[in-house]
Regions:
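Motif I (Walker A/P-loop) of helicase-class P-loop NTPases
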Residues: 35-44, 165-170
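SF2 helicase catalytic motif II
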Residues: 113-133, 140-183
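Conserved nucleic-acid-binding Ia/Ib motif block in the N-terminal RecA-like helicase ATPase lobe
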Residues: 51-104, 197
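Conserved C-terminal RecA-like helicase domain
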Residues: 56, 64, 71-80, 276-357, ...
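Conserved segment of the helicase C-terminal RecA-like domain
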Residues: 374-377, 381-383, 389-429
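Non-catalytic terminal extensions of ATP-dependent helicases
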Residues: 127, 332, 351-355, 442-725
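Conserved interdomain linker/interface between the two RecA-like ATPase lobes of SF2 helicase motors
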Residues: 174, 181-183, 188-200, 204-285, ...
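Conserved pre-motif I regulatory segment
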Residues: 1-28
């Protein structure tokens, strides 16, 4: 079968046939094999039918990338973008949005709290106010946004098990009307059939699974050290077993050694390292050494300069002389903290094949399609904020899968920097990585207080209990309980023959074995009872009791004023609601309010130091906010949702400066940090803008306040914050 002049691979053809037959489909295929072509086909199929489709992505950068791709493919009038930052053509038949936006739309009704594109001096009309008031049920197919919706494409569907965001994925799949088809895409998931069985059960229609295990460009994994050079894993193992170099106190292998060993044909290369500071440091260090001179000879300096000159016309203060010298040698760096415009420049240079080495963190591998000839890992462990932990197979393959460019390379090389000193610790992990023994998707379902109040606003407790029973977490618990029940039956049958014999007929060893069997059976029965506990319902009841205790709900689950506020708050839910109730936002000017929200959305790196504010007013704000932050209600809420409340007061004056119109570089002068933090600050301003949008919904009945907040949103939506990155 051909599509767009391409002969489809068998797995693509299988998925397309299921789509044509009207099925929902889950597709698991390695990075670079063409999963997105299936999504393109579905979109085209639905457009031809006069319907609508939503494409959800886990991150805004990927949403923005898909928007650019689909406007080029289907035309600007056919494609819309809806994220927390931007709303473009929201009524288009093809809409790209983050997963959270669609979930909010289904849970809350209306636009899910997304800002309309209104002019700063435009007051909200009655229709706009009524959008906020809608109370349609999550499964109500008559929401205006989904009346003609035929399908939802969920990219990176394995995010179901993400600890911080997986609940949103589950809620979306539970609330989505069953008439709407699903296309789920994943690079790797060992139990996708289990996910399909769950969806088949709750959606009452057969959900198909399509798998592709072969890579379009096969991977070859190498180990590299000064003593061995770049060698296949098997040879590295043999050298290690032979004792070569082990424990001899040899010189450690550095990043530049690897590039010195690499032949020209192995470039371009992505170098993954899990530290922002080292991403920048290593890139600049490589440019200064002998390897930098080698790479400089390979670089197209003239073409790079053309890009740099165009960039500097628009952003004259972003690049330092050292930055430009590094980029001119075809060496780049990329992480979430760098200036958004610089990030876009680096991606532009890389796509134009003008960078031969790109140092990056794992965020570069998430969804964005930028393959390389070679992928290099600085190591196979990373710091997760608490401990140094091994990479999961899924994380490793997400990054390793960038090696090998389809249609250009016959093979993609994956090189791991590894000395003999700690190879004992790495070997078991390496075996799992090479075998691609991907971890199963495990539910991380955990309702927020925002979800709880929105559910009780429109459902009784039995309906909510039924909804919780439809979650993937409940499905997995039931499945495990069934398996355990079968084991118990087998154990009982196994014990039966021995149990029938009188004790006097048994010898000491047989008696001991019978006691062991009884204990084992009792343990299995206790485990089964534990598995059958309605944990989600118990958790829901605890949160419900919390909301009653602190007067958010009546004893009959009617919404009190705090809960009516909470229905619109999605970030730092209880903390922000309590700040509103305490009146601490009332006396703040709009610019101060924006600054205050910045303190609730970002945590600074440990080494970052922010200049103390000169204005005494901020010390009073800090004290007021801190009193709420340390209050019993906020502390107890934090325990119940098992996440830490964000409170970073030193960022507040920086946010106020942005709202006043100060330039990003001037604001950055007030922060001392070893790495570029402009990207962090821009991300902070964007999330604070989201919070202002939520406050705007809270004040739906106060036209003057809403108008003021709308103006504030337009004021902060400028320059870097408005960049479509």
């Amino acid at each position: 079968m051909d599509y767009r002049g391409l002969t489809l691979d068998p797995f693509q053809e299988e998925a397309v046939e299921y789509i044509e037959d009207g099925h929902s489909v889950l597709v698991a295929a390695p990075t670079g094999t063409g999963k997105t072509l299936i999504a393109d086909y579905l979109i085209e199929h639905i457009l031809d039918d006069g319907g609508e489709v939503i494409y959800t992505a886990p991150v805004k950068a990927l949403s923005n990338q898909k928007y650019r791709e689909y406007t080029a493919l289907f035309g600007r009038d056919k494609v819309g973008l809806v994220t927390g930052d931007l709303v473009i053509n929201r009524d288009a038949p093809v809409r790209i949005m983050t997963t959270e936006i669609l979930r909010n739309m289904l849970l809350e009704g209306g636009h899910g709290g997304v800002m309309e594109d209104v002019e700063p001096d435009e007051a909200p009309d009655e229709a706009e106010l009524s959008d906020i008031e809608q109370t349609a049920s999550p499964s109500d197919s008559h929401l205006p946004e989904i009346e003609r919706l035929q399908a939802v494409i969920i990219d990176e569907i394995h995010f179901l098990d993400d600890p911080s965001r997986g609940t949103v994925w589950e809620e979306l799949l539970i609330y989505l009307p069953t008439r709407i088809r699903i296309l789920g895409l994943s690079a790797t998931a060992s139990n996708l059939e289990e996910v399909a069985s769950w969806l088949t059960e709750i959606r009452e229609t057969d959900v198909k699974v399509v798998r592709e295990n072969e890579r379009a460009v096969p991977l070859k994994i190498y180990m590299a050290s000064l003593e061995t050079g770049i060698v296949p894993v098997k040879k590295f193992n043999n050298l290690y077993k032979g004792g070569r170099g082990r424990g001899n106190g040899g010189k450690s292998t550095r990043h530049y050694h690897l590039f010195d060993m690499m032949q020209d044909w192995r470039f371009p290369a992505l170098y993954f390292i899990f530290s922002r500071k080292l991403v920048e440091k290593l890139a600049r260090g490589l440019a200064r050494g002998d390897v930098g001179r080698k790479l400089s000879k390979m670089a197209d300096t003239q073409a790079i300069n053309e890009h740099l000159n165009a960039f500097e016309e628009e952003y004259p203060e972003v690049l330092s002389p050292r930055d430009k010298a590094t980029l001119r040698k075809g060496i780049g760096w990329h992480h979430a903290g760098i200036h958004v415009a610089l990030k876009a420049l680096v991606e532009e240079l890389y796509e134009a094949r003008l960078l031969n080495v790109l140092y990056c963190t794992s965020t570069f591998a998430l969804g964005i399609n930028m393959p390389a000839r070679t992928v290099v890992f600085d190591g196979l462990t990373k710091y997760n904020g608490v401990d140094v932990v091994p990479l999961t197979v899924r994380e490793f393959m997400q990054m390793a899968g960038r090696a090998g460019r389809r249609g250009i390379d016959e093979v993609g090389d994956v090189i791991v920097r590894q000395d003999f000193d700690d190879y004992d610790e790495v070997q078991p992990l390496l075996g799992r990585l090479i075998a691609e023994e991907s971890e199963p998707i495990e539910s991380s379902f955990n309702l927020t207080f925002h979800s709880v109040v929105n559910l009780v606003a429109r459902f009784d407790e039995e309906e909510i209990r039924s909804m919780l029973e439809r979650s993937f977490r409940a499905f997995q618990a039931r499945t495990e309980a069934e398996r355990l029940g079968e084991r118990i039956e087998d154990k009982r049958a196994e014990n039966a023959a021995v149990e029938q014999q009188p004790e006097e007929a048994l010898g000491p060893e047989a008696m001991q074995e019978r006691r062991r069997s009884r204990r084992k059976l009792a343990a299995l029965e206790r485990e089964l009872a534990e598995r059958r506990r309605p944990r989600l319902w118990e958790d829901f009841q605890r949160k419900l009791q919390f909301l009653r205790t602190y007067d958010y709900l009546t004893a009959h689950n009617e919404l009190e004023p705090p809960a009516r506020i909470l229905r619109h708050i999605k970030i730092e839910e209880i903390f922000l609601t309590e700040l509103i109730l305490a009146g601490h936002l009332e006396d703040l000017t709009p610019t101060e309010l924006f600054g205050a929200m910045c303190g609730l959305v970002v945590s600074l790196p440990r080494r970052a130091k922010v200049r103390r504010p000169d204005d005494d007013k901020w010390w009073e704000v800090f004290a007021n906010f801190e009193a709420v932050y340390e209050s019993e209600v906020v502390v107890r809420a934090e325990d119940l949702v098992d996440s830490e409340t964000v409170f970073t007061p030193e960022v507040m004056p920086l946010g106020e400066r942005w709202a006043r119109g100060d330039q990003l570089n001037d604001i950055l002068d007030d922060i001392r940090n070893p790495t570029d933090m402009s990207g962090d600050l821009v991300g902070c301003f964007r999330r604070a803008k989201d919070m202002i949008g939520q406050l705007r919904d809270v004040y739906y009945s106060d036209a003057a306040r809403r108008k003021e907040l709308t103006r504030l949103i337009h004021r902060v939506s400028r320059d870097e914050v408005e960049v479509l990155d």
